[in-house]
């Protein structure tokens, strides 16, 4: 058994490709625990900030902590479906799913991301 506690002031800032007007922070990495497969991040999107539509590299979960995020998912027929998410709402999608998001609210939105990496 292994574990790692991360305090808010220990979150690591990083640049997420295709993201704009956002502060992205990393809370946990797979190497934090024995046999780990989860990457956990917290993103702070300014109004109008978001991420361009792109295929997901991993299975992922978005959980909205505060604010409003419009998540766009592209189906197998290349049709876009938009979902307006608020605090407490979440979306779970598989690897390869084309997705994007945009803060369509008037305040900074906080979104917790969970990325599940396949085991090697």
List where the protein language model places each region.
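Short histidine-centered beta-strand/loop micro-motifs
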Residues: 30, 50-56, 73, 82-83, ...
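A short, N-terminal "cap"/entry segment at the start of jelly-roll beta-barrel domains
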Residues: 1-39
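Histidine-centered metal-chelating micro-motifs
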Residues: 49-52, 70, 91, 95-100
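Short, conserved beta-strand element in jelly-roll/cupin
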Residues: 44-46, 56-71
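Short acidic-glycine-tyrosine-enriched beta hairpin
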Residues: 76-94
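Conserved short histidine dyad/triad with adjacent acidic residue
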Residues: 26, 39-56, 95
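Ligand-binding loop in jelly-roll beta-barrel domains
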Residues: 86, 95-120
């Amino acid at each position: 058994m292994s574990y790692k506690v991360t305090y808010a002031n220990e979150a690591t800032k990083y640049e997420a490709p295709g993201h704009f007007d956002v502060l992205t922070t990393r809370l946990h990495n797979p190497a934090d625990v024995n046999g780990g497969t989860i990457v956990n991040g917290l993103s702070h999107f300014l109004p109008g900030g978001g991420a361009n539509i792109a295929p997901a590299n991993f299975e992922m979960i978005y959980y909205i902590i505060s604010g409003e995020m419009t998540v766009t998912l592209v189906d197998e027929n290349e049709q876009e479906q938009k979902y307006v998410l608020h605090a407490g709402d979440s979306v779970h999608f598989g690897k390869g799913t084309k997705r994007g998001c945009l803060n369509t609210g008037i305040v900074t939105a906080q979104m917790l991301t969970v990325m599940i990496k396949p085991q090697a």
